Design a protein with these regions (language model features):
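Transmembrane beta-barrel wall of Gram-negative outer-membrane proteins
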Residues: 262-378, 404, 617
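Periplasmic N-terminal accessory/gating domains of Gram-negative outer-membrane beta-barrel systems
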Residues: 48, 53, 77-79, 83, ...
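Surface-exposed extracellular loop regions of Gram-negative outer-membrane beta-barrel proteins
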Residues: 148, 432-434, 450-455, 527-548, ...
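Outer membrane beta-barrel strand-and-loop segments of large Gram-negative receptors
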Residues: 467, 471, 478-479, 527, ...
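C-terminal beta-signal and adjacent terminal beta-strands/loops
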Residues: 519, 795-804, 830-885
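Periplasm-facing N-terminal accessory domains of Gram-negative outer-membrane beta-barrel systems
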Residues: 1-70, 74
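Signature of Gram-negative outer-membrane beta-barrel scaffolds
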Residues: 372, 463-465, 469, 481-626, ...
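Gram-negative outer-membrane beta-barrel transporters
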Residues: 691-696, 712-803
Length: 885
């Protein structure tokens, strides 16, 4: 900000991002000198300061007209500050929102999933997946440093934002309208995450935080005994099938199967432990070297480590077959209550290099690695209507997730002309998810309060078995963009063109081993008198004993898939007076390929090549220097994800439901229209209001199949989605609240799905679409005292989690809705000297329940709402410290 000096003294300060400043000085008459780069220096005389009374000054700076001879400047545009972010938002040809590293540093957010919640119009689902304008996360596209990201999940089309530590983010931008230079698969938002770059100066920082959750910390939790490698998030290396274990037990004789079964680990019982406070440690260092000829070289390295516990105690998990209108009672498919425990270890590493010379050449090499190891156990008890009995289900698993993204990129001024630039990018990304040994076992109630081990007659992975799963995804990318700014008469048109290629592969494998009753010479009483783990020793495991092992691997639960995307675009920007027009056309060729099985004798081969054109138009009209009107149109696409077209059935042992793919899914096509008014009363204040409309053809939704907890994916005939969005960033100085500011974003959305004529009586919202989203925050920042604080509020309206499927226009099972939660977060930061900063925060102060529900006809002209899932994750209190060396 501007520098303010009391003339004739050494007393002075600089203005903050909002232009506010405070100088403490005794009574008297003073002269102030105010200066800022490219503005005229101002000298204010006869400033009277009275005892006990603040003197308020409003100073307007005037731009300086400057004529310079040829000067060679080597500079790096700062992209990590609030001011630079707001400038990017205002000058962008698209509607865009974002958050800077400067704002992130004022919070206790540990990863990108928490950071992104602070972006206007954005919410997070399941603490990992982003929702823009209330639209399902499948309609977003996420890029990291100018290249696509791999899916970190095996069963959903989404990028998991919790793999990127917050201290590695330079800025995060969300484009809400399309343009030719961006991928066509971005209907909700196109999210670009930029990691940090060349530092301004050499530095080293260390950060530590500790957190207490009132539902988890210092309470009892249950896990299988851990492994040494768990601490590094690499526990899969010490789990899984033993070396040399047979590839297919069905090919072995009985004695061979028994011998292989004894090689497997015999630990099944989760042991009690105390959930420790969540902790995070991060160390970052940056160095820069000024080279000859004005060139610079910089490197930045960041390492973070965290461990966290979470618990869902007494989680309600009910599924209904129907509602009995005669007796006014629900008929349950199952009625469970569960305790679920998680222990999470993560390591994050970022290592970036950058080189920049005086002739407009910049080279970057960026690397991001995240390793997460999550140990989970669940105890579920309740009524199973299929089996007509009460059961207790026990499940333990370890899952490992690794995500890596590496990119080499460059930008060049052609012929030394910064109006004629070429940039390029090559990238490689990898993600895996490995579950090396999920163990499930159960007990059945045989009389009131008396439970016995379930030794299935028919093999059942849910009742007694082990599951081994692995998923590996690779992405190779390359792209280049050429931009030419020309001066034709009084116009300054810009032409931009580029190409992009992406090749993605996935290999998914699952192996299922189950145990069944061996009908040996043991009575039920004898068996149940034994500790459960004893059943897996040589005396009881094998043919003619208590248990025998079976290979139940289903070939349909394994698949390979590939996707090739090539794209090219041309875009032209023409400023005409107060009007700025940008028109573009993007061409994309996409080929989705998948090799799988319905069953051993019915292979599935998907090969779907398609070519399409995606026009876009972004226009803006500058009503005056502070007011802007935007109008935008674009066509976008939403393609099925690998998992959605793979015919495998995935059973979620925690949630107790199954999801099966649909190889017949079609692409969804969307037309988007946006109108937005923007007002910038000051460099740090904004007010915007927007209207948007989207029409979908063949939208992809998750639907229930028949009665029960089996879900799949299907195309609806069509859908419309329209609404309004308001955003306000306002300093509260005008009402006497110095250093306070207000941020509000609210969206109201109406959506409806189109059905075939035979189903015209059915009306509902688009699956995953919320009718409203509200984000609000009040901020306090006093740079002189080194204090900042904020209070954040968020709510998202009820939305369909799983849509009902129709049969001849009849709803078989009602839609399952995710219900609203009001969330309030608070954080407080205090700087002590120039090196230490303390942070305090409370997340989810209200700690409202997470709920899903269905609504049934009660038979009397009314309706009744029944809860499916209900649980509470509690509130979290955090304390952290950041030290700059």
């Amino acid at each position: 900000g501007a520098a303010i000096l009391v003339e004739g003294t050494t007393n002075g300060t600089t203005a903050d991002i909002d232009g506010n400043f405070e100088i403490k000085i005794g009574p008297g008459n003073y002269t102030l000198v105010v200066s800022y780069v490219s503005y005229k220096t101002q000298r204010l005389t006869s400033i009277v300061v009275s005892a006990g009374k603040p003197t308020v000054l409003n100073i307007e700076m005037e731009e300086a007209a400057m004529e310079l001879e040829s000067v060679q400047v080597v500079a790096q545009v700062k992209t990590d500050t609030d001011l630079s972010l707001l400038r990017s938002v205002r000058t962008s040809i698209q509607v865009v929102s974002g958050i800077s590293s400067q704002q992130i540093s004022k919070t206790l957010d540990k990863d990108a999933s928490e950071v992104v919640k602070r972006v206007p119009g954005v919410t997070i689902q399941d603490n990992r997946f982003i929702v823009v304008r209330g639209l399902n996360q499948r309609y977003n596209n996420v890029w990291l440093n100018n290249a696509g990201t791999p899916s970190s999940e095996t069963d959903v089309k989404a990028f998991s934002f919790d793999v990127i530590p917050s201290n590695m983010i330079d800025n995060l931008l969300i484009y809400k309208t399309g343009s030719a230079e961006n991928p066509a698969e971005a209907t909700g938002g196109f999210i670009k995450i930029a990691t940090k770059n060349i530092p301004d100066a050499n530095f080293t920082t260390a950060e530590y935080s500790i957190a207490y959750n009132d539902r988890t910390t210092l309470r009892e939790a249950y896990f299988l005994p851990g492994k040494t490698a768990d601490l590094a998030g690499l526990g899969q290396l010490q789990r899984g099938l033993p070396s040399g274990f047979a590839a297919d037990l069905n090919k072995l004789p009985t004695a061979g199967r028994d011998a292989e079964a004894l090689k497997l680990p015999g630990q099944w019982m989760a042991q009690p432990t105390t959930a420790l406070p969540n902790q995070k440690l991060a160390i970052a260092t940056g160095h820069r070297w000024n080279l000859t000829g004005g060139a610079r070289l910089g490197t930045l390295t960041s390492l973070s480590y965290s461990n966290a516990y979470s618990t869902r105690s007494n989680m309600q998990n009910y599924m209904y077959e129907r509602y009995d209108t005669q007796n006014q009672l629900p008929v349950y498919l199952y009625k469970y209550n569960a305790d679920i425990y998680n222990r999470d270890y993560r390591i994050g590493l970022m290592h970036n290099w950058a080189y920049q010379n005086a002739y407009g050449t910049k080279l970057e090499f960026k690397n991001l690695l995240n390793v997460a190891g999550i140990q989970n156990s669940s105890n579920t008890e309740g009524w199973n209507n299929y089996r007509m009995s009460n059961f207790r289900y026990y499940s333990s698993q370890y899952s490992s997730r690794t995500t890596y993204s590496g990119q080499l990129s460059g930008k060049h001024n052609l012929n030394g002309d910064d109006n004629n630039t070429l940039d390029w990018n090559t990238g490689f990304a990898y993600a895996n998810r490995i579950e090396p040994d999920r163990q499930n076992w159960s007990k059945k109630e045989v009389s009131a309060g008396v439970y016995q081990y379930v030794l299935p007659d028919v093999p059942s992975i849910n009742e007694l078995g082990r599951l081994f799963m692995n998923n590996h995804e690779f992405i190779y990318t390359a792209g280049s963009n050429w931009e030419k700014k020309t001066g034709i008469a009084a116009l300054n048109p810009t032409f931009k063109a580029g190409v992009y290629a992406e090749y993605k592969t996935r290999n998914f494998g699952e192996r299922s081993l189950t145990y069944r009753n061996a009908y040996g010479p043991f009575s039920t009483t004898q068996i149940n008198a034994l500790p459960f783990e004893t059943l897996f020793t040589e005396s009881y495991l094998g043919q003619g004993k208590v248990l025998s092992i079976d290979e139940q691997t289903n070939v349909a639960n394994n698949y390979s898939a590939q996707n090739l995307l090539t794209a090219g675009y041309a875009q032209f920007t023409l400023p005409v007076g107060k009007v700025n027009l940008t028109a573009g056309l993007r061409a994309e060729f996409n080929r989705l390929m998948l090799q799988g099985y319905y069953n051993a004798s019915s292979p599935v081969n998907v090969d779907e090549p398609e070519f399409d054109l995606f026009p876009s138009l972004n226009s803006s009209y500058n009503l005056n220097e502070k007011t802007l009107l935007r109008l935008a149109y674009s066509r976008s696409m939403n393609r099925p994800e690998f998992r959605e077209v793979a015919p495998l059935t995935y059973y979620d042992f925690t949630e107790k439901n199954s999801v099966v793919g649909n190889p017949l899914l079609k692409n969804a096509s969307i037309h988007n229209l946006d109108l937005r008014f923007e007002f910038y009363p000051s460099p740090t204040e904004t007010f915007t209001i927007a209207a948007f409309y989207k029409h979908f053809t063949n939208p992809i939704e998750m639907v229930s199949i028949g009665a029960g907890s089996l879900y799949s994916f299907a195309n609806a005939l069509g859908a419309t989605n329209y609404g309004v969005e308001m955003e306000l960033k306002k300093s509260l100085n005008f009402i006497g609240l110095q250093n306070f500011s207000l941020n509000i974003n609210a969206s109201l959305i109406k959506s409806s799905v189109e059905f075939a004529d035979t189903e015209s009586e059915r009306t509902r919202a688009l699956q995953g679409q919320s009718p409203y989203v509200v984000n609000a925050g009040i901020y306090y920042q006093n740079d002189n005292k080194g204090i900042s604080a904020n209070l954040m509020y968020n709510v998202m309206g009820e939305r369909i989690l799983v849509a009902a499927q129709l049969n001849q226009g009849v709803v078989l099972v009602p839609d399952i809705y995710e219900m609203p939660r009001h969330v309030i977060d608070f954080s407080f930061n205090k700087k002590i000297g120039k090196q230490l900063e303390l942070k305090f925060g409370i997340k989810d102060i209200l700690a409202q329940d997470h709920r899903t529900q269905q609504t049934y006809d009660d038979g009397n002209g009314g309706s009744i709402s029944l809860a499916n899932k209900r649980y509470n994750t509690g509130r979290t209190v955090s304390l952290g410290a950041n030290w700059k060396f």
